Amino acid sequence: MCRLIPFGVLDGRDIPLIELSDGRCAVELLPYGAAIRALRVPDREGRMTDICLGYDDVESYRTLDACLGGTIGRCANRIGGAQFTIDGTTYHVTANEGENCLHGGVEGFHKKLWDFTCAENAVTFTYTSPDGEEGFPGTVRVEVTYRLADGTLTIEYRAAAEKDTVVNLTNHAYFNLGGHDSGEVGGHVLTVRADRYTPTDSGNVPTGMLASVEGTLLDLRTSTALESRLHDGAFNGGRGYDHNYVLSGGEQLASELWCPATGIALAMTTSMEGMQLYTAGWLTERVGKDGAVYGPAQGVCLETQHFPNAVNCPAFPSPILRSGETLRQWTTFRFFTR
């Protein structure tokens, strides 16, 4: 079931909250950023729990950073040096994180007002990114569809370009399976089905190499409690995880997250080859939904994607979308208790 609820006004335009429910779970979506605002699932006692960080007003989404729940594009993650070359032509895109381009630039897709259509169990958002937006070549039409059925949220991405360009889409939901207002996620247990990761330089930009997780704190192939990893000063400067994993591939389980306190778990599968694991180490203090105060280490992002900086790394799978081709990607989150 899909219903619209008044949420706010932006630039004179009414912004509704779009709610999908399958009778067991419910997701709240916003046309601003094609974003997930809330996701309510039952805990082991049957109590409905909102497990995504979000805001109570449109203005917070417009003015604050961190991309809470937003659709990220035109190119998710980092492009080293904020430039790339396609067929001999070099393009300079917006540098909004030092010398690099992060999450599509200053006004990425998470800062755009999308059109939408509703169906019984799905919402499709559409946005047309003009040629030259944030420096990226070619006009690109993007569709993002959210489907909710049988306790599973599916996100489907489609894109078509009028000119060869870079497209790398993801969702930046911050999951806290203890409840969005429950504090740090140290009690969560995480598994990531990946034998390798992409090492980075000092700017967190992949160098083009792959490395084994064996013998490192990045090895999450068996269920691992996050508590010891979030504030270890010897690990990523005490900021926790902000690393891209090379998923083992296939339409099998890519990652699983579980909160023993509530019993809520999610199992994630995806068509993508990479996943940025981010445990919100750089999330600055801010007021979220219902007056909750969010801060570092209070969410887990499972950002399925092409590898960061792939357009500048020939050994990585290419994020280039050719004119006349259609990009199709998907990610599913299945919610259950144990």
Q: Regions from the language model: what does each represent?
A:
Residues M1-R338:
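An exposed, glycine/acidic-rich loop-and-rim segment of catalytic or binding clefts
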